[in-house]
A protein has these predicted regions:
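Leloir-type glycosyltransferase catalytic cores
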Residues: 1-48, 159-197
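Active-site and donor-binding regions of nucleotide-sugar-utilizing enzymes
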Residues: 1-10, 93, 117-121, 135-137
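Flexible, charged surface loops at secondary-structure boundaries
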Residues: 46-50, 79-83, 120-124
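Catalytic donor nucleotide-activated moiety binding site of glycosyltransferases and closely related
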Residues: 51-62, 71-115
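Charge-rich alpha-helical segments
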Residues: 52, 65-67, 71-72, 146-149, ...
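Short catalytic/ligand-binding loop motif for oxyanion handling, primarily in non-cytosolic enzymes
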Residues: 62-65, 97-100, 137-138, 155-159
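Well-ordered, non-membrane alpha-helical segments in soluble/globular domains
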Residues: 69-77, 119-122, 189
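A donor-sugar binding/catalytic signature common to diverse glycosyltransferases
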Residues: 117-162
Length: 197
């Protein structure tokens, strides 16, 4: 996915921010997720170029609820923006509450779709919002803006080590943030207003 020295960073290392930062120190790569052009052309969504396209991934894990998205907050956020020129594209393997499917500014990609298609869809959106999960981790290497919400009680010591006393990971650009706090409607709206076209 991420090119480095004429090759690619392994999927295992791409899922570790510590490993990515080591590689960044050594190679100073520029974030640029890449896929085979034929695959990307085949699997991306063909949406109106004039609208804001926001990829969203929310964690809804019934077995491990720590870090789950605050669905009421997200629903209210989407509802407030229902009559704007923004389309929120939900990716992931979770089933969302029925009321989410009734919002006309929400496009929910089938949970049966392959992971590769979801990643390509996410890459081709204008920015990304979501919970800290494996699927979100791939977006760390995108060159688009993103806000990822990490549960403040989920591995706090590891996260502190990853940041290494800094506010951001080494390879993150200006408009790429992992926020170690709970999502609120106010926070979501703040970054939506900042990143929208």
């Amino acid at each position: 996915f991420q090119k480095i020295n004429q090759g690619y960073i392994s999927a295992k290392k791409q899922n570790s921010t510590l490993e990515l930062q080591k590689l960044y120190k050594k190679n100073k790569f520029k974030n640029n997720l890449s896929f085979k052009k034929t695959l990307e052309s085949k699997l991306k969504l063909n949406l109106n170029k004039k609208i804001n396209k926001v990829a969203v991934h929310l964690k809804i894990d019934m077995k491990n609820k720590l870090g789950n998205a605050k669905l009421k907050v997200w629903f209210n956020f989407f509802k407030k923006l229902e009559n704007t020129n923004t389309k929120f594209i939900m990716i992931g393997k979770y089933h969302y509450p029925k009321k989410f499917y009734n919002l006309n500014n929400l496009y929910i990609v089938s949970h049966k779709e392959c992971l590769l298609k979801m990643l390509i869809i996410s890459k081709n959106c204008d920015f990304f919002l979501g919970s800290a999960t494996g699927l979100s981790t791939i977006n760390l290497l995108n060159n688009k803006p993103y806000i990822i919400f990490k549960h403040p009680n989920h591995h706090p010591k590891i996260f502190k080590k990853e940041l290494n006393n800094k506010k951001k990971l080494l390879f993150q650009t200006k408009n790429q943030l992992i926020i170690n706090e709970f999502e609120t409607e106010k926070t979501l709206m703040k970054y939506y207003e900042k990143f929208k076209k």
